[in-house]
Regions:
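P-loop (Walker A) phosphate-binding loop of NTP-binding proteins
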Residues: 9
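Small-molecule kinase domains that catalyze NTP-dependent phosphoryl transfer to phosphate-bearing small molecules
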Residues: 145-197, 202-210
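ATP-dependent small-molecule kinase phosphotransfer cores
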Residues: 37-99, 103-107
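ATP-binding Walker
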Residues: 12
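Conserved phosphate-donor/acceptor-positioning beta-strand/loop module used by diverse small-molecule
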Residues: 98-106, 119-143
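Hydrophobic anchor at the beta1->P-loop junction of P-loop NTPases
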Residues: 6
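Post-Walker A helix-loop "phosphate-sensing" segment adjacent to the P-loop in P-loop NTPases
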Residues: 23-32
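Walker A/P-loop
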Residues: 15
Length: 210
């Protein structure tokens, strides 16, 4: 068992990298970890594929029952509080597969602690997805059409939050990968497949090692 954790700011392309890595993995060796969230689904997001979407009451119940191995609460621009997290049943620690998840720095530290507690602390590889700030902002604005003022404010809030809670992960993660264009995205996806198969080429070809 191995866990690859992708860490990166809003609109850094983490989802695109993950999907491309799974597309390249023809043998199904990499298993995507699906996070659970209490935020509303975006257009075209599918429950059980992109996220497990739950309401606030269900989220509180799951927290009370200690079902999450990591989670974080976000207060968004309209005052709502959203929960994102990974449930313990998403990762089989006895499996011979490689799991891949998208996570923030706080969640990464919780995941790291959880894996150490179950004797799998050496099975975690964390990769920071680095993108120029201007590109991230443009992607965020283009991701949704006809943005309301509240949605624009939320994008701004996320970017400010990233500087505090995500960008420090660049120094914390095992390695850093640039993702400023489609070519970078493909390289990142290939590297993830090398990591999943214990292929040393990922170390030689990584864009920036810590």
């Amino acid at each position: 068992m191995k866990v690859i954790a992708l860490v990166g700011c809003t609109a850094s392309g983490k989802d695109s990298i993950l999907k491309e890595a799974l597309r390249i993995d023809k043998q199904g060796f990499i298993i995507p970890v699906i996070s659970t969230t209490s935020r509303p689904a975006r257009e075209n997001e599918i429950n059980g594929k992109d996220y497990f979407f739950i309401d606030h009451n269900k989220a509180d119940e799951m927290l009370k029952n200690d079902e999450f191995l990591e989670y974080r609460k976000y207060k968004v621009a309209d005052g709502s509080i959203w929960i994102y997290g990974i449930t313990k049943n998403q990762i089989d620690i006895e499996s011979d597969k490689t799991y891949i998840c998208i996570i923030d720095l706080q969640g990464l530290k919780q995941l790291e602690s959880y894996l150490k507690d179950v004797g799998k602390g050496d099975k975690l590889v964390s990769l920071f997805v680095d993108v120029k700030a201007q590109i991230r902002l443009m992607r965020a604005l283009q991701r949704e059409s006809d943005l309301t003022d509240i949605q624009v404010n939320e994008i701004c809030r996320r970017n400010l939050d990233d500087y505090k809670n995500v960008i420090p992960g660049k120094k914390y993660c095992s390695a850093v990968m640039e993702n400023n264009n489609k070519n970078d995205m493909y390289k990142c996806a290939m590297l993830i497949n090398h990591v999943a198969r214990n292929d040393d080429r990922w170390i030689k070809n990584i864009i920036c090692m810590k």
